[in-house]
């Protein structure tokens, strides 16, 4: 089976790497020439780290390397069985990609979007094959996270959903099936918890590390909400929150000012080296300096207000 991945960012690279390791002929396309040139190096480096940790054999990594192709033009990889879109979280951009794919790909191709919050049904409307469009929401980092949400749009056929489930399982992932609603299941729950944790930091209730420890030790969460937000990407969290606030008409998804400030300053979490934490590779290395500064301001304001009461 041939798989095309559109988008060579963090998620696209992770998805392509997983597909090639699982035995699929995998092609990656990105409209940015710099991203095209860099993607193979990123993916092969991730495989090398997995080999060092004993999670992948050198032989499997070498075979995957030969299955991985990089396309300079989208039409070069159009003859695929699955086309998985992993471009930035913007509805118009995703619809444009799917419309172009619809013109280039054969009728058998199933289109999947890695969106974490946008409507699969709306995305499918950009194509003439609405029954063959499905959501495949992978989690970052793809090589580590075992979950994929399989999202069924209003017109997604049972056959398309079944084939998507089979693909997910063949990658060694666990699938959960959800209907096409704003934020699906994981983003809606995860963003709710993450935003409230950010508000607590912002208002001086507790430091980021203490909030995370409270959820990890008190509720058995593998990772606290702020560490998770840094891993997902604070820019992604902000985009999802704005989408959910609009789609569900609910202020509980209103992004806190600390989130907007960090994103505006480029401090988007692990991929930027700093967010609510400072990061060294994949591991947190202390609190983020800017988020701590913003939190101190919040505590000072809260203390002053309490004094005036």
Task: List the predicted regions and their residue ranges.
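Rossmann-fold dinucleotide-binding core
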Residues: 110-180, 184-188
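NAD(P)+-binding Rossmann beta1-loop-alpha1 motif at the extreme N-terminus of oxidoreductases
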Residues: 1-49, 53, 104
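NAD(P)-dependent Rossmann-like dehydrogenase/reductase catalytic/cofactor-binding core
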Residues: 22, 169-180, 202-203, 208-309
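Rossmann-like NAD(P)-binding element
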Residues: 35-38, 49-111, 118
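Amphipathic alpha-helical segments at domain termini/boundaries
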Residues: 3, 21-23, 62-82, 163-172, ...
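Rossmann-like dinucleotide-binding cores of NAD(P)H-dependent redox enzymes
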Residues: 28-61, 150-161, 175, 182-190
